[in-house]
């Protein structure tokens, strides 16, 4: 082989080597870019997941706020209703006292007394419609949670610890005792 051919061979080999190096370089760059793309995709996926978690937490917080607000509103509403009922009870007492006195004075047939009786019945039926339970009935067993004893009497017809008579009715609204019934019970 002559020099010229050797030179051409070297040049071709150099060109091939350069091409190989360029291919390797491009291949390395491609691998590097793929790694970078995968890292970016991973970050995007993590960010989306985190955003989704934040949204879910935010929605849960909103639900909790709604529930707590509803509970508070219900509690305030019940407290106001209880307060209203407590304001009505003295009026009921006054009407019952008038009817008791009218019975003693034998005035039950008077139109004004009959009007008072109807008013009292109307008030009591309204309370019942709104969920107020009226406590204290004759021949009912005494319960210290809902009854106050104002007197004890001996009785041949009523068993011990049973109510002989009710002096003032008791009122309960949703497990809240607005007023205990004032009762007379039989002695033990």
From Swiss-Prot:
SUPFAM superfamilies per UniProt? Coiled-coil domain of nucleotide exchange factor GrpE, Head domain of nucleotide exchange factor GrpE
Q: Which GO terms describe its molecular function?
A: adenyl-nucleotide exchange factor activity; protein homodimerization activity; protein-folding chaperone binding; unfolded protein binding
Q: Which UniProt keywords apply?
A: Chaperone, Cytoplasm, Stress response
Location relative to the cell: Cytoplasm
Q: What is its main location?
A: cytoplasm
Query: Ranges of Basic and acidic residues compositional bias?
Result: 1-29
Keyword Ion transport: yes or no?
Answer: no
GO:BP terms for this protein? protein folding
Q: Which InterPro entries match?
A: GrpE, GrpE_coiled_coil, GrpE_head
Sorted alphabetically, the Gene Ontology cellular component annotations on this record are: cytoplasm
Q: Which residue stretches belong to region Disordered?
A: 1-33
Q: What does this protein do?
A: Participates actively in the response to hyperosmotic and heat shock by preventing the aggregation of stress-denatured proteins, in association with DnaK and GrpE. It is the nucleotide exchange factor for DnaK and may function as a thermosensor. Unfolded proteins bind initially to DnaJ; upon interaction with the DnaJ-bound protein, DnaK hydrolyzes its bound ATP, resulting in the formation of a stable complex. GrpE releases ADP from DnaK; ATP binding to DnaK triggers the release of the substrate protein, thus completing the reaction cycle.
Subunit field text: Homodimer.
* Family under the similarity heading: Belongs to the GrpE family.
Q: Which PANTHER family match?
A: GRPE PROTEIN, GRPE PROTEIN HOMOLOG, MITOCHONDRIAL
Quote the protein name from its UniProt record: Protein GrpE 2
Q: Which organism is it from?
A: Buchnera aphidicola subsp. Schizaphis graminum (strain Sg)
């Amino acid at each position: 082989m002559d020099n010229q051919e050797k030179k051409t061979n070297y040049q071709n080999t150099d060109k091939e080597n350069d091409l190989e190096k360029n291919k390797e370089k491009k291949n390395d760059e491609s691998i590097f870019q793929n790694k970078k793309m995968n890292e970016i995709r991973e970050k995007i996926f993590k960010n989306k997941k985190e955003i989704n978690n934040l949204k879910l937490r935010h929605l849960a917080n909103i639900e909790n706020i709604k529930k707590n607000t509803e509970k508070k509103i219900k509690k305030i509403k019940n407290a106001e209703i209880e307060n209203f009922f407590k304001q009505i009870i003295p009026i009921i007492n006054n009407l019952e006292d008038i009817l008791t006195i009218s019975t003693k004075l034998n005035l039950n047939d008077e139109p004004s007394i009959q009007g008072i009786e109807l008013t009292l019945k109307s008030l009591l039926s309204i309370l019942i419609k709104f969920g107020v339970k009226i406590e204290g009935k004759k021949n009912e067993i005494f319960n210290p949670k809902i009854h106050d004893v104002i007197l004890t009497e001996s009785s041949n017809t009523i068993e011990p610890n049973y109510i002989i008579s009710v002096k003032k009715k008791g009122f309960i609204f949703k497990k809240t005792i607005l007023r205990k019934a004032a009762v007379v019970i039989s002695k033990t």
